[in-house]
Amino acid sequence: MSQQFNVAIFGATGAVGETMLEVLQEREFPVDELFLLASERSEGKTYRFNGKTVRVQNVEEFDWSQVHIALFSAGGELSAKWAPIAAEAGVVVIDNTSHFRYDYDIPLVVPEVNPEAIAEFRNRNIIANPNCSTIQMLVALKPIYDAVGIERINVTTYQSVSGAGKAGIDELAGQTAKLLNGYPAETNTFSQQIAFNCIPQIDQFMDNGYTKEEMKMVWETQKIFNDPSIMVNPTCVRVPVFYGHAEAVHVETRAPIDAEQVMDMLEQTDGIELFRGADFPTQVRDAGGKDHVLVGRVRNDISHHSGINLWVVADNVRKGAATNAVQIAELLVRDYF
């Protein structure tokens, strides 16, 4: 990558935005000039990037014509407003919010799963980053899907509070400190107390009884696999862990496959770290700061002749958001610029 690119991060002061900055630097993305953008209240804040100090600018006053690629993670409403403006100025926007994910002409991309979909960015100059839980699940399931097909996915997620941003992290920390010191916990970000608790609700409830987070996994899986016939049955749970999401995944395959075959395939797949036997990954011990999807507890389902069980763990802020976006940008500049 000898060519250099002007890159903007919109939502630069949020948890994902700050991690995007780290990942761009760690992966040595070919940045010529970096622009950090946020709302007026964050204007003037500074960050270090490649040995230089970069000042956060007010997005309302920014000239998008300076930028080749923009990574958006400032919330759906702001993406709805600014992504079309940036795209019209010639910027390729990689959006981390859910706003554009279900538009038929916007590609929804996990680089390890459907990299060919990136080509569709030319439709509107926008690429959507999937939901964190969908990303890690589909990276793990792609080898199985390619080998024997998947009829149905049952998944229960155990999602950390960082999925709700800095407010979620602060609420868990604050509630834990208060409760351990004998004070009542205040609840603002989540529907119930999150400290020492599990909440089977992420996002709002839909008319069918599922939450929006759960339905995201359904819609996104079908779109990314380009397979509307695949059935997905999710339950999404918020747990009192700061970083990292875990998932108990059960799949019914279109043809039987042995767990040993599955493990052999996973072991040979880029982006996956496999744990065999009695060893297994956890959010706290293994996921933090990693860009791989971690898979363990792979076994045949004793109740179904074509069933496979997996335990899937990843850093939701990195692979579930920032790293996936940067990986999309890497493919974009490698194959399309």
Curated annotation (Swiss-Prot):
<dbReference type="InterPro" id="IPR036291">
    <property type="entry name" value="NAD(P)-bd_dom_sf"/>
</dbReference>
<dbReference type="GO" id="GO:0019877">
    <property type="term" value="P:diaminopimelate biosynthetic process"/>
</dbReference>
<keyword id="KW-0521">NADP</keyword>
<feature type="binding site">
    <location>
        <begin position="13"/>
        <end position="16"/>
    </location>
    <ligand>
        <name>NADP(+)</name>
    </ligand>
</feature>
<comment type="subunit">
    <text>Homodimer.</text>
</comment>
<feature type="binding site">
    <location>
        <begin position="162"/>
        <end position="163"/>
    </location>
    <ligand>
        <name>NADP(+)</name>
    </ligand>
</feature>
<dbReference type="Pfam" id="PF02774">
    <property type="entry name" value="Semialdhyde_dhC"/>
</dbReference>
<feature type="binding site">
    <location>
        <position position="216"/>
    </location>
    <ligand>
        <name>phosphate</name>
    </ligand>
</feature>
<dbReference type="GO" id="GO:0009097">
    <property type="term" value="P:isoleucine biosynthetic process"/>
</dbReference>
<dbReference type="InterPro" id="IPR012080">
    <property type="entry name" value="Asp_semialdehyde_DH"/>
</dbReference>
<feature type="binding site">
    <location>
        <position position="316"/>
    </location>
    <ligand>
        <name>NADP(+)</name>
    </ligand>
</feature>
<keyword id="KW-0220">Diaminopimelate biosynthesis</keyword>
<dbReference type="GO" id="GO:0009089">
    <property type="term" value="P:lysine biosynthetic process via diaminopimelate"/>
</dbReference>
<feature type="active site" description="Acyl-thioester intermediate">
    <location>
        <position position="132"/>
    </location>
</feature>
<dbReference type="GO" id="GO:0051287">
    <property type="term" value="F:NAD binding"/>
</dbReference>
<comment type="pathway">
    <text>Amino-acid biosynthesis; L-lysine biosynthesis via DAP pathway; (S)-tetrahydrodipicolinate from L-aspartate: step 2/4.</text>
</comment>
<dbReference type="InterPro" id="IPR005986">
    <property type="entry name" value="Asp_semialdehyde_DH_beta"/>
</dbReference>
<comment type="pathway">
    <text>Amino-acid biosynthesis; L-methionine biosynthesis via de novo pathway; L-homoserine from L-aspartate: step 2/3.</text>
</comment>
<comment type="function">
    <text>Catalyzes the NADPH-dependent formation of L-aspartate-semialdehyde (L-ASA) by the reductive dephosphorylation of L-aspartyl-4-phosphate.</text>
</comment>
<dbReference type="GO" id="GO:0046983">
    <property type="term" value="F:protein dimerization activity"/>
</dbReference>
<feature type="active site" description="Proton acceptor">
    <location>
        <position position="245"/>
    </location>
</feature>
<dbReference type="Pfam" id="PF01118">
    <property type="entry name" value="Semialdhyde_dh"/>
</dbReference>
<protein>
    <recommendedName>
        <fullName>Aspartate-semialdehyde dehydrogenase 2</fullName>
        <ecNumber>1.2.1.11</ecNumber>
    </recommendedName>
</protein>
<dbReference type="InterPro" id="IPR000319">
    <property type="entry name" value="Asp-semialdehyde_DH_CS"/>
</dbReference>
<feature type="binding site">
    <location>
        <position position="159"/>
    </location>
    <ligand>
        <name>substrate</name>
    </ligand>
</feature>
<dbReference type="GO" id="GO:0050661">
    <property type="term" value="F:NADP binding"/>
</dbReference>
<keyword id="KW-0457">Lysine biosynthesis</keyword>
<dbReference type="GO" id="GO:0004073">
    <property type="term" value="F:aspartate-semialdehyde dehydrogenase activity"/>
</dbReference>
<dbReference type="InterPro" id="IPR012280">
    <property type="entry name" value="Semialdhyde_DH_dimer_dom"/>
</dbReference>
<keyword id="KW-0028">Amino-acid biosynthesis</keyword>
<feature type="binding site">
    <location>
        <begin position="41"/>
        <end position="42"/>
    </location>
    <ligand>
        <name>NADP(+)</name>
    </ligand>
</feature>
<keyword id="KW-0560">Oxidoreductase</keyword>
<dbReference type="GO" id="GO:0009088">
    <property type="term" value="P:threonine biosynthetic process"/>
</dbReference>
<feature type="binding site">
    <location>
        <position position="101"/>
    </location>
    <ligand>
        <name>phosphate</name>
    </ligand>
</feature>
<keyword id="KW-0791">Threonine biosynthesis</keyword>
<keyword id="KW-0486">Methionine biosynthesis</keyword>
<feature type="binding site">
    <location>
        <position position="238"/>
    </location>
    <ligand>
        <name>substrate</name>
    </ligand>
</feature>
<comment type="similarity">
    <text>Belongs to the aspartate-semialdehyde dehydrogenase family.</text>
</comment>
<dbReference type="InterPro" id="IPR000534">
    <property type="entry name" value="Semialdehyde_DH_NAD-bd"/>
</dbReference>
<dbReference type="GO" id="GO:0071266">
    <property type="term" value="P:'de novo' L-methionine biosynthetic process"/>
</dbReference>
